[in-house]
């Protein structure tokens, strides 16, 4: 099965065929760095990180560009409020964005250009649009004339006349048409500016991405990504100005991730219903957040809530507990795990595990080839984990065959982990990290829990079962669940 992607431009799933065989050029709109990033930003960046990883896993050479918008009205307004230079704001939030993305396990893109470092390219592009009759100067502003670009709105499938009739747009004497958009803004007193043929000013938002993407990827490239909220006006305007300037198709495949919702409303700063990445990571492990963001298909809406994050944490724990059990099995039989498995000698449950483990890479590939369906891919992992748990619970001894099966499962999950960017932690350490984080929210310390477990073990040894039960019940009242095994007593947070 060939990789198929949903192209917003055509509204259909299409076979993904790179313009240049073996190579992929991909641009994703980055953040405007004026404030803390929220979970909507996290989703977009994790989604395209996984797409980047998957394309590379197919043996493709990927040139991945993600920009920073480091000059904008919002940046200037914040700088004025704080009484600092605009670039003090942008640099502060670039560093914070980079830290957030590193915590979420993102790979670095090939290039991360800043708008302010590409002013000459932006000015050249604006001048080209003027020379070709697609843009006009009005005072110190330069605007794009949407009526001159016939395919305008082909991405969002809107109608220009309907939009003009239905919109409540204030008359702007600097525009010939209400939907014309700014390419170059005249600087107001006290604002940062750059010299240009049209006077002192700065670039508009849309032209920045066109100039940077075409510099690093060429006039036509394979993938342009971003959130659905960018389809109009940002990506629509990018298409108009880029294709008007070059006379060539701008992008072959347009990919857009769905919104993160709270109470059925899109999470956004403008609505005031957002949670920053830092706020969420103060409460949940970064791998839990990444797991949650990949638990739905990237184009589907994703409902954000404590309950859904807790459910994601529980699901991830289930997989990691199976990985710990696998590691313990391999540790108990260290000389085995690499030999061939004789399928004909396996029992029913072992044979099911053997088959599902062996087919996992193919099933994962089929899911990802279907428009990067991480939700289905993760479902296959859960299916395999159920088989692992059944086989290990029914096993009467840690045989060589069992170790070989465990080694196969671990290797195949590892291949998937590298693409999804999850299940990459050392399993026992990850579970300890999750447990300690949960315990920190309880009104009992980890040290006290461990002390009581030691006291309970002594009580059981002395056959003081009354005291043993008292300790167990006391801890259960604190949401601490004890699990007794031959290796001792472990605990978890309910």
Swiss-Prot record:
GO cellular component, one term: cytosol
Motif, 'KMSKS' region: chain positions: 266-270
MF GO annotations: ATP binding; cysteine-tRNA ligase activity; zinc ion binding
Catalytic activity: tRNA(Cys) + L-cysteine + ATP = L-cysteinyl-tRNA(Cys) + AMP + diphosphate
Keyword set includes Thylakoid: no
Positions that bind Zn(2+): 29, 209, 234, 238
Family membership noted in the UniProt record: Belongs to the class-I aminoacyl-tRNA synthetase family.
UniProt protein name: Cysteine--tRNA ligase
Species whose genome carries this gene: Geotalea uraniireducens (strain Rf4) (Geobacter uraniireducens)
């Amino acid at each position: 099965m060939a990789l198929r992607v949903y192209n917003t431009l055509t509204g259909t799933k299409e076979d993904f065929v790179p313009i240049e065989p073996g190579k992929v050029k991909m641009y994703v709109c980055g953040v405007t760095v004026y404030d803390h990033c929220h979970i909507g930003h996290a989703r977009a960046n994790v989604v395209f990180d996984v797409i980047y990883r998957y394309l590379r896993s197919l043996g493709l050479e990927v040139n991945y560009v993600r920009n920073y918008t480091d000059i904008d009205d919002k940046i200037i307004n914040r700088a004025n409020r704080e009484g600092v230079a605009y670039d003090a704001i942008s640099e502060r939030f670039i560093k914070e964005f980079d830290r957030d993305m590193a915590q979420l396990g993102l790979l670095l893109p090939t290039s991360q250009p800043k708008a302010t470092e590409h002013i000459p390219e932006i000015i050249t592009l604006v001048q080209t649009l003027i020379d070709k009759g697609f843009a006009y100067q009005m005072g110190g502003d330069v605007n794009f004339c949407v009526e001159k670009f016939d395919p305008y709105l082909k991405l969002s499938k809107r109608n220009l006349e309907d939009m003009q009739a239905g919109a409540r747009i204030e008359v702007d004497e600097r525009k010939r048409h209400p939907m014309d958009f700014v390419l170059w803004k005249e600087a107001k007193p006290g604002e940062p500016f750059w010299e240009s043929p049209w006077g002192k000013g700065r670039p508009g938002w849309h032209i920045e991405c066109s100039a940077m993407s075409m510099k690093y990827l060429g006039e036509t490239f394979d993938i342009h990504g971003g959130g659905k909220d960018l389809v109009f006006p940002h990506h629509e305007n990018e298409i108009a100005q880029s294709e008007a300037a070059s006379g060539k198709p701008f992008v072959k495949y347009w990919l857009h991730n769905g919104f993160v919702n709270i109470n059925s409303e899109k999470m956004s700063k403008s609505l005031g219903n957002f949670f920053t990445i830092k706020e969420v990571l103060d409460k949940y492990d970064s791998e839990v957040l990444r797991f949650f963001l990949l638990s739905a298909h990237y184009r589907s809406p994703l409902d954000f809530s404590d309950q859904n994050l807790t459910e994601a944490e529980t699901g991830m724990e289930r997989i990691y507990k199976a990985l710990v059990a696998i590691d313990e099995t391999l540790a108990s039989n260290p000389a085995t795990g690499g030999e061939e498995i004789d399928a004909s000698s396996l029992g029913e449950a072992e044979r099911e595990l053997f088959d599902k483990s062996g087919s996992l890479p193919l099933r994962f590939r089929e899911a990802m080839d279907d428009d990067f369906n991480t939700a289905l891919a993760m479902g296959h992992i859960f299916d395999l984990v159920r088989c692992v748990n059944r086989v290990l619970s029914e096993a009467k001894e840690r045989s060589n065959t069992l170790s070989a099966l465990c080694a196969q499962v671990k290797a195949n999950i590892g291949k998937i982990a590298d693409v999804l960017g999850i299940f990459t932690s050392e399993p026992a350490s990850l579970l300890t990290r999750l447990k300690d984080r949960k315990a920190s929210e309880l009104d009992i310390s980890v040290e006290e829990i461990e002390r009581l477990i030691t006291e309970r073990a002594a009580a059981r040894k002395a056959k003081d079962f009354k005291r043993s039960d008292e300790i167990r019940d006391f801890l259960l009242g604190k949401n601490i669940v004890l699990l007794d095994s031959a290796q001792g007593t472990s605990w978890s947070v309910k």
